[in-house]
Each structure stands twice: as structure tokens, then as C-alpha cells.
């Protein structure tokens, strides 16, 4: 499974990125790359937390795809 990262620039210039398949997983950054890196790290933490609590997670080979 691939997680889709949607990214857009806010009016204040910051970038907001969100993992569409993981509700609530979003992050800001001063640049596109920073916002993407932050949301990828957060998504991996969420997935690790789910695994720790015995929840199933989708099989992952190519984890992220970025869209604008």
C-alpha cells in the first residue's frame, strides 16, 4: 500500500502536508520538503503505535506518494 501525501501552501506561506489514508496525520513546514518530512515521520510513528497495540496495518512496500 502507498500512503498519499497531499501538500498545499497556506496563505501565511507555510506548507501543510497530510496523509490522506491516516485521518488526522498532518504537519506544517517552512518548505515543501520540510512539511513532507514531518508528516512522513508522524505517519511512521502512528503506524508503529498501531503495531504496538496489536492493530493491523496495511502491507507496505513503497510507502509514500506526494501530490499537490
Protein language model regions, located:
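Short, charged, surface-exposed hinge/linker loops at domain edges
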Residues: 1-4, 37-68
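A short, exposed loop/beta-hairpin motif centered on an aromatic-Gly-Thr core
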Residues: 23-34
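Short aromatic-glycine-(Arg/Gly/Cys) micro-motifs in beta-strand/loop hairpins
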Residues: 7-22
